[in-house]
Amino acid sequence: IDVSGVSKSFASKSSRPIHALSDISFSIAQGEIVGLLGTNGAGKTTLFDLILGLTTPTSGNISVLGHTPHAAIRAAQIGAVLQTGGLLPELTVQDTLKMISSTFPHPLPIGEVAKQADLDRILHRPVGKCSGGEQQRVRFALAILGNPQILLLDEPTAGMDAQARHEFWSTMHRQADQGRTIVFATHYLEEADNFAERIILLHEGKLRADAKATELREHSGKRIVEAKFDGTPLNAKELPTVAEISLSGGYARMTTSDSDVLAKFLLNHTSAHDLTIRKHSLEDAFLALTASQS
C-alpha cells in the first residue's frame, strides 16, 4: 500500500471545509502487520475508505499492489472488516458465505474459510442468533472469501468481550503466518502493542508517528516511577531531579529522565514504599504524542 501526499476534505455547513486528512504519506510492504492508532476524529476511518476506494482523495495518490484501489477491489486483492455494514439476520452463516462467495472470481472453499474463521460449529445457525463475537467472525470470513493479499480491519474487536478478543487475535496470528498484509485500527492499545509490528499514529488528520511500538515507547527517553506514601504529601521542590508528578491520595506517579536518582532519594528521604520503575507503555507514548501536538 502506497499513500503519497494524501489529503481529504469534506464540505461543511459553515464556509470552512473539514480537513479529515492532511498530506499523509507512508508505504506498507507485503506481509507487514500495521496498527493504525488515533483519537476519535483522527482520520482512521477516512483513510480506510480511501484505501478501499469508497471515496477519493482531495489531493495525493493511493496505490494498492501497484493498482488503483478500485482495481484492487475488483481483483479481490483486499478484504475488509469495517465498523459499518450489516448482515442478513435470517440467513444462516453457511448461506451467507455461499451468497458472498458467488461474487468473487476465485473464492476460497467455504469449508476452508469456515475453519479459518472458527465457524465450523455454527454454519447452520441463523446470523441473527449469533453473538457479537460470532458475527464479527462471520464478517472476517466474508473478508477472506476472495483470498485477498491485504486485510483491513477497522475496530475489529469492538463490542467483543475479553475471551472473544483473544480468540479473534489468535485467528489473526494464523492469517499473518500465511503472509497476508494486515492493517488494523483499534482503540485497544494493548492489542496494537501485542500484535502490530509497526504503529502508524494519526492525530487531527495528520501523521504524528510511524515506527515500531518499541520505538514509540522509547520516544521520550523517560521512565515512570510510582510509589505509595505515608503521612506528609510529596513536595516536588524537594526532589533532586526534575519530574512530572501526578498525586492521588497517598499515591504518586512521577515521570523523569533520571529514575535511579529519584528512586534512591524517595526510599532514603521520604515515606515512599511499594516503589516501581517502568518504561513508558504504548498508552503513555500515545498520550504524550497526541497531547504535545494538540
Residue ranges and their predicted role:
Residues 98, 102, 108-123:
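Conserved ABC ATPase "signature" region
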Residues 39-43:
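Walker A (P-loop) phosphate-binding loop of ABC-type ATPase nucleotide-binding domains
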Residues 60-70, 74:
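Conserved ABC transporter NBD signature motif
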